[in-house]
Curated annotation (Swiss-Prot):
The gene is SLC16A2. The keyword Thylakoid does not apply. Belongs to the major facilitator superfamily. Monocarboxylate porter (TC 2.A.1.13) family. It comes from Homo sapiens. It catalyses: 3,3',5-triiodo-L-thyronine(out) = 3,3',5-triiodo-L-thyronine(in); L-thyroxine(out) = L-thyroxine(in); 3,3',5'-triiodo-L-thyronine(out) = 3,3',5'-triiodo-L-thyronine(in); 3,3'-diiodo-L-thyronine(out) = 3,3'-diiodo-L-thyronine(in). It is linked to Monocarboxylate transporter 8 deficiency: Consists of a severe form of X-linked psychomotor retardation combined with abnormal thyroid hormone (TH) levels. Thyroid hormone deficiency can be caused by defects of hormone synthesis and action, but it has also been linked to a defect in cellular hormone transport. It is a multi-pass membrane protein. It is found in: Cell membrane; Apical cell membrane. Changing residue 463 to L: In MCT8 deficiency; impaired thyroid hormone transporter activity; does not affect localization to the cell membrane. This is Monocarboxylate transporter 8. InterPro entries: MFS, MFS_dom, MFS_trans_sf, Proton-linked_MCT.
Amino acid sequence: MALQSQASEEAKGPWQEADQEQQEPVGSPEPESEPEPEPEPEPVPVPPPEPQPEPQPLPDPAPLPELEFESERVHEPEPTPTVETRGTARGFQPPEGGFGWVVVFAATWCNGSIFGIHNSVGILYSMLLEEEKEKNRQVEFQAAWVGALAMGMIFFCSPIVSIFTDRLGCRITATAGAAVAFIGLHTSSFTSSLSLRYFTYGILFGCGCSFAFQPSLVILGHYFQRRLGLANGVVSAGSSIFSMSFPFLIRMLGDKIKLAQTFQVLSTFMFVLMLLSLTYRPLLPSSQDTPSKRGVRTLHQRFLAQLRKYFNMRVFRQRTYRIWAFGIAAAALGYFVPYVHLMKYVEEEFSEIKETWVLLVCIGATSGLGRLVSGHISDSIPGLKKIYLQVLSFLLLGLMSMMIPLCRDFGGLIVVCLFLGLCDGFFITIMAPIAFELVGPMQASQAIGYLLGMMALPMIAGPPIAGLLRNCFGDYHVAFYFAGVPPIIGAVILFFVPLMHQRMFKKEQRDSSKDKMLAPDPDPNGELLPGSPNPEEPI
């Protein structure tokens, strides 16, 4: 029996401890000396009688090592949890319709009403000049800040809006933004002071529009994935219809009522938007709902973690992204000038034309067409060659701005405005796909937010500079020539981005090939692995 137990000990390994305990008490004098080994006090609390082998499995110490192995197996899968989260695209399937179409209508109202008012700022600017001309004859520079501030704040607040959207959700952020925009427009009707309208219309209305606009784009991803392109197309087409109708509406209101009552009528669109924003029922959880896996103990560490998360500057390590963002920011200096000063220029140069709002309708119509067409065209262009569409858009935008003073009839201005709207649609639509190509999908949101923030300051400064040139030279000719220069400079800068990206990609390929050549054999035994290069033939 002792020989068999030794042989089985070599064969069975750790389970032989149980066999030894079963064989020791049978016919051997060792039970008296059994309490001497200290590591195993559990199996012999009371010495059992020799002729009874049945109760021996009860004090069997074999389950102890089995429990230890099981505990290790339980802790092994913990670092990779399999709990499915709704915040990821893999664990969530959007409904692809249903209540989502109500959300699409709300997003269409949001985009159309916000940009319909902002794109018609030229009419509001001319109405504002009529009120301020009695106080100051050279008011073009001061009055241009009102519309420029409102448009610039939409872009300037974009990085901050992304933080609020992530923490509070789309519904709360959009509703609060629409409420602020309503307050800004409504309070603008109770004051005639230009400095107060800087705050009420320029800052309050502009910031409110930014907080209401960005969640309308994010919420579509909660309800659509496979049909997201269709949903975005419906929103773009609907907002274009708004952009075409708002110039006619504002001009009609300006002819019948004063500017103050016009602000009150426009504020009703923001009130309706505030109600429609309540339909932004989120289907994906915000980051506040997802528990953090890493415990942040102190308040200081938690604050630093949030700063690293939301103000991640890693996108600026990409040289191509820095050049691309700088080129677009440079082009934005003259981008918004025609929207603000075109109506006043037509009133001065073509005083016999009464339907000046037709020019803004043309810009809105071709802008919507450009957004629809550019999406399909950009899908067929691989990689960063999409930037060449932006290069072409900025070149045409700059040339068309310079051609505005050269037009001697109203029909020529209509043709110029058609091209201006088309360039606007191409430029805006392909911005997100280019950001995905430059920094990847994980950092694309931050890249777009930083880009919009960089565009804010040039867009705010452009119209007042053009108004200052109008005051200095007495007409808008030099102002529109100035507006055409920055887009052309931006186009030249953007032209080199794909070339530099291709050069950097080839350099990385050469470096990686050198690393592979200098890398040691991955097989420690020196055997030839499948797919490895053929070794040299033996001599």
